A protein has these predicted regions:
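Short, structured segments at the rim of ligand-binding sites
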Residues: 1-414
Length: 414
């Protein structure tokens, strides 16, 4: 599907979807908790639906009610082996690998798109050192797990994916004894591990932080909080806020200003670029602004690179985004894809090993290829609002992965 966007005003209001990061964690913990959990905002993104489908195969029941979802936890061990289709969701795969191992489930994980190329070796190695047999097969790609995870020390690199750490945090309390997560280097995107800690607290569990990682008690049972309110997604709000700075104003609703989501840092980052952003009871409003160039290290908030890149393409003076080498292993090589997309629209963008450099010359328009990456497609749409000529976004349906309502909101009558 192709969508052509003419330069002009952004929608005046946008409601962001349920936080994908919070949603994965909440669904998995609710599936393992004592008692049912009610989520007032039902998931809609492809990634969260993938997690729900896998949990359903593992024995979880979901009852959809009007504007809510009731989660009934896993009732008993399902027949083995399970086939768990993670679709294109890295979070689903990396969270459920250790959870299935902790439950002693024999499971075959499958996926599609770029998921088979995304790294998981260090996580599998940690599981294999603690009682699990794992076999990775190609053509078709799948990972088969067998055995039951045993308590102990789990060593992980910190510079590959914080999702490894979060997956173990979710799983290790289920083991018969205490365990420890030990990081062999500094943890990138540490805020996402902090988000997992916060969600664990909401299900009644406190972890102990150590200089090298965490100590995790064993033999625990998660306690459902009953009703679990989740916030809106700050990584998606970032696109609307960038759109407001370029072609606003845009008022974003559905966000928790005190959220633990790392992507909440989009507010000070845009203000660092001289953006005018105001908070009110109605929401967060970004106004048209004369953006100025700046340098941003996105190692702690890598999902913000695409919306920041769209804004930096129009900023006065040079801008740089650094700390983003891991984005080469996302749904696309997000660095190369973002640079190529903006160049195709007439931008002066230099790709660096771990980031991008922008001359801030503005964009002409043309055809934007997001390489099947939902975040690149949304960045192209935001940039199109301030281009001199129309922009045609190819493969526009890829936004279904995280934000199915995106185009409906974006193309509303202004």
């Amino acid at each position: 599907m192709e969508i052509t966007i003419c330069p002009g005003k952004a929608p005046r209001r946008a409601a962001v979807p349920l936080s994908k990061s919070e949603g994965h964690r909440a669904l998995i913990l609710a599936a393992m908790a004592q008692g049912e959990t009610l989520l007032p905002r039902p998931p809609a993104s492809g990634d969260l639906l993938a997690t729900m489908d896998c949990l359903r195969q593992m024995g979880t029941s979901f009852t959809e009610r009007e504007n809510s979802l009731l989660v009934t936890p896993i009732a008993g061990p399902p027949a083995a082996p399970l086939r768990l289709d993670c679709r294109e969701s890295g979070s689903t795969l990396r969270f459920l690998l250790p959870v299935a191992a902790a439950l002693g489930l024999r499971a075959i994980f499958t996926g599609r798109g770029r998921l088979p190329q995304r790294p998981v070796e260090a996580l599998l190695a940690a599981l294999q050192r603690n009682g699990i047999t794992a076999e990775v097969r190609q053509h078709p790609w799948e990972i088969e797990l067998a055995g039951r995870l045993t308590p102990g020390a789990f060593s992980l690199p910190g510079n590959v994916s914080s999702q490894y750490v979060s997956g173990l945090m979710l799983a290790l309390p289920l083991l018969t004894g205490p365990s420890e997560i030990r990081l062999t280097g500094a943890l990138e995107s540490a805020g996402y591990a902090g988000m997992t800690e916060e969600m664990l607290r909401r299900f009644g569990l406190e972890l102990e932080k150590t200089p090298m990682g965490w100590r995790i008690p064993g033999g625990m049972k998660y306690q459902s909080p009953g009703r679990l309110a989740l916030g809106g997604d700050w990584s998606h709000a970032a696109f609307w806020l960038a759109a407001g700075c370029l072609a606003g104003p845009v008022t974003v609703t559905g966000l928790e200003p005190e959220s633990t989501q790392p992507d909440r840092v989009i507010l000070p980052l845009l203000r660092q670029m001289s953006a005018r952003i105001e908070l009110s009871p109605e929401g967060i409003t970004a106004y048209p602004s004369r953006l100025t160039g700046t340098a941003v290290d996105v190692s702690g908030c890598p999902d913000l690179l695409p919306p920041l890149a769209a804004a930096m393409a129009f900023a006065k003076r040079e801008s740089r985004l650094t700390g983003a080498a891991r984005l080469r292993l996302k749904e696309s090589d997000r660095l190369a894809g973002m640079a190529g997309l903006l160049r195709a629209l007439g931008g002066r963008v230099e790709e660096e090993p771990d980031g991008l450099r922008f001359a801030g010359s503005g964009l002409r328009g043309g055809v934007a290829d997001p390489c099947g990456d939902h975040r690149l497609a949304m960045a192209a749409a935001v940039a199109a609002l301030a281009c001199r000529e129309p922009v045609t976004v190819k493969d526009a349906e890829c936004v279904e992965k995280s934000y199915p309502a995106w185009w409906g909101l974006f193309c509303e009558e202004k």
